[in-house]
Each structure stands twice: as structure tokens, then as C-alpha cells.
């Protein structure tokens, strides 16, 4: 176990149940810092970095804010193929379809060597329920810019973003957020 105080990261070698022969670390820090330090600790660059599984989708412009996608992007910046994986549900019960999507995406990356970074969004459920896997460009949506001043659970006044989403992609665009609606 060691700490890199300048960046506020710590890393501890861990054993993963069922994967005892795999070198693994638990790293604190931002997702992109964890990916970069993890690659360094491996001693040599990995063939693939998988980030996730995130609870909740990372669709369209959400990818610009996503730590899950950011970690995958960090790997791709250094020339390592990367996949970000998200479960559409915020409280997932079954990650099987995410695993299936990851497996299919890994096959796709093997078949098309030019693919460096892909983002997988899968619904919650069993792989047998999967209706297919589709490669699409990112959609475009935005959130309200208004904030409301309200008390939090401790009675402190806090600003909260208004809920809602505005889809900017056209209805017939073949983009990611249209396939999971």
C-alpha cells in the first residue's frame, strides 16, 4: 500500500474473489487518475481498460461529464483500447446484459482494430432479453440551467438543479439515446 500525496491518490494491492491470479489494485482518486495510475502499476500497458459498470446511463452529451467514460478516455489517450460500461438503471439488479454488451464490444474491437474507445449502455436484465447490439454515434441533449435554493436534509440552504432533460437530437436520428428510450 502506498500514497502519492501530490495527487492525493492511494493504491493497495487486492485479491479479487475468483480471480486470485490476476494482479489488482484498489485505487482512490478520480476515475481518470485511477485508470492512469492503474496502468502504470501494471508494469506494462494493458491490452484493454474496462471502466464501470456505472449505475445509470452515459448517453449523448452525458459522456462529457462522466467519470466512467473519463477513465476510458484516459486509457485511449495513452493508446490503450478502452470500453466504458453503464447499466441504464440507477439501481440495477442484474448486470448480465452489461456483461453481454461488454463481450460483444470486445469482439467488435478485435474485428475493427481502429476502434479505440467505445461506450456501452445496457438495460438492466438477463442477456437472453437482449434484442441486439448497435453501434451508434452519440446523441445530443441538455439539462435545465435553472437552480432552486432549497434546504437540504440538515436544513442548510443549497442550490439544486431542476430535473428534466431536453433531447436535441432529431426524432429519426440514429443515435444512442434513441435506442434506449
Regions found by a protein language model. Give the residues of each.
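Electrostatically charged, flexible surface regions
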Residues: 97-181
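Glycine/threonine-rich flexible loop motifs
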Residues: 57-66
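Glycine-rich phosphate/pyrophosphate-binding loops
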Residues: 76-97
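A cross-family phosphate/adenosyl-ligand binding-site feature
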Residues: 1-39, 45
Amino acid at each position: 500500500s502506498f500514497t502519492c500525496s501530490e495527487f492525493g491518490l492511494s493504491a493497495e494491492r487486492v485479491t479479487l474473489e475468483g480471480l486470485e491470479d490476476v494482479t489488482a489494485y484498489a485505487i482512490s482518486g478520480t476515475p481518470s487518475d485511477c485508470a492512469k495510475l492503474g496502468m502504470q502499476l501494471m508494469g506494462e500497458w494493458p491490452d484493454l481498460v474496462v471502466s464501470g459498470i456505472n449505475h445509470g446511463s452515459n448517453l449523448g452529451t452525458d459522456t462529457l461529464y462522466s467519470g466512467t467514460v473519463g477513465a476510458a478516455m484516459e486509457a485511449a489517450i495513452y493508446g490503450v483500447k478502452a470500453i466504458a460500461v453503464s447499466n441504464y438503471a440507477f439501481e440495477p439488479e442484474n448486470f448480465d446484459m452489461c456483461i453481454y454488451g461488454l463481450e460483444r464490444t470486445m469482439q467488435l474491437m478485435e474485428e475493427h482494430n481502429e476502434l479505440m474507445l467505445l461506450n456501452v449502455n445496457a438495460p438492466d436484465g438477463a442477456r437472453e432479453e437482449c434484442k441486439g447490439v448497435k453501434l451508434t454515434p452519440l446523441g445530443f441533449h441538455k439539462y435545465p440551467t435553472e437552480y432552486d435554493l432549497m434546504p437540504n436534509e440538515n436544513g442548510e440552504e443549497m442550490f439544486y438543479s431542476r430535473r428534466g432533460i431536453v433531447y436535441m437530437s432529431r426524432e429519426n436520428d440514429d443515435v444512442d439515446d434513441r435506442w434506449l428510450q
